[in-house]
Amino acid sequence: MVTVEEVRKAQRAEGPATVMAIGTAVPPNCVDQATYPDYYFRITNSEHKAELKEKFQRMCDKSQIKKRYMYLNEEVLKENPNMCAYMAPSLDARQDIVVVEVPKLGKEAAVKAIKEWGQPKSKITHLVFCTTSGVDMPGADYQLTKLLGLRPSVKRLMMYQQGCFAGGTVLRLAKDLAENNKGARVLVVCSEITAVTFRGPTDTHLDSLVGQALFGDGAAAIIIGSDPIPEVEKPLFELVSAAQTILPDSEGAIDGHLREVGLTFHLLKDVPGLISKNVEKSLTEAFKPLGISDWNSLFWIAHPGGPAILDQVEAKLSLKPEKLRATRHVLSEYGNMSSACVLFILDEMRRKSKEDGLKTTGEGIEWGVLFGFGPGLTVETVVLHSVAIN
């Protein structure tokens, strides 16, 4: 008879969880940020609100975003006029879109990740699917399993309604799954479509306008497992540790409520201040065991909630401007895609590191940090170790 200890030992992987492939996808409809205020106020029948439009124009100008991608185009919005109002019953129409489109966009990203990984999809043992766009049963995880033709025995975890920190959460969960299940290969998918949050402007809730200026659609997929098969699987980053915390005195700073009118977001003005004030504590706790206290010695992946968050974190930690290059690049090219952002940034970083002939996937640096920020205020902190580029 074997003992529980022997079974337990046999179940565990030897090495750390490793990112082995990354894929991303966006809808075809690209929106230019410079002309977006004109389009937004026209499509929502709000052109008479001239002062509000000027405010929105300033928000868009300050957003540091050049373009975004959105499933919602003029045709779809004209068919669903209630989505263009500020507070009209529209959840059914929104759900009809996202329940179908979220798994589809997720599939596009997953297909790219599986291709890069180079292994048959039958070897995927676990699926973690994350979205803040809509809710359904069976979930988007089930729909994606069908769309990809994964094995019916794939072990699924569906994360709905987490918000912008969840790109860190999925890495934390995938790390535990990979390291505690020998041979596990975890497909992680974050897919976000703003059809659930899009709404017309109002004078009374300017925080809602902030979201309209920042949010974009996108999906990212990664494959994570321990003990990569030599010559077959190519490691990109190792996941060394992962932590989650709720910031003190931050209740109500970022809230989202799913109602008849869709998903409404509410932000307090001091979100950037709350994050920047507390970010060093999370860094210290994560990197003290490694003997690292110079934040400029790390490579950086931070959820780009908005430019003010990045500016204040940069200032608070005296980061060199190049530290947030990959993060700002993704914000500029795609906007805030909620949970998918940090995975887009990981992809951008490894791509640019190789292109620039650097020694590692982490901009030539050995150790790095990935931050997710979102409702709660919740912060996810993931310690990454880069891999040498041959």
UniProtKB/Swiss-Prot annotation:
Asked if Transferase is a keyword of the record, the answer is yes
Domain of life per record = Eukaryota
Q: How does activity depend on pH?
A: Optimum pH is 7.0.
Temperature and thermostability: Optimum temperature is 35 degrees Celsius.
Q: Name one GO biological process term.
A: polyketide biosynthetic process
Claim: Transferase is one of the keywords in the record: yes
Q: Which InterPro entries match?
A: Chalcone/stilbene_synt_C, Chalcone/stilbene_synt_N, Chalcone/stilbene_synthase_AS, Polyketide_synthase_type-III, Thiolase-like
Q: Tell me the keywords, alphabetical order.
A: Acyltransferase, Flavonoid biosynthesis, Transferase
Q: What EC number is given for this enzyme?
A: 2.3.1.74
| Enzyme class, spelled out | transferase
Q: Which residues cross the membrane?
A: none
Q: Which GO terms describe its molecular function?
A: naringenin-chalcone synthase activity
Query: Reaction catalysed?
Result: (E)-4-coumaroyl-CoA + 3 malonyl-CoA + 3 H(+) = 2',4,4',6'-tetrahydroxychalcone + 3 CO2 + 4 CoA
Could you tell me which PROSITE patterns the record lists for this protein?
CHALCONE_SYNTH
Its UniProt pathway annotation is: Secondary metabolite biosynthesis; flavonoid biosynthesis
Give any Pfam family that matches. Answer: Chal_sti_synt_N
Q: Which residues form the active site?
A: 164
Which family is this protein grouped under? Belongs to the thiolase-like superfamily. Chalcone/stilbene synthases family.
Protein task: The primary product of this enzyme is 4,2',4',6'-tetrahydroxychalcone (also termed naringenin-chalcone or chalcone) which undergoes enzyme-catalyzed or spontaneous isomerization into naringenin.
Q: What PANTHER family does the annotation carry?
A: CHALCONE SYNTHASE 1 (PTHR11877:SF80), HYDROXYMETHYLGLUTARYL-COA SYNTHASE (PTHR11877)
Name used for this protein in its record: Chalcone synthase
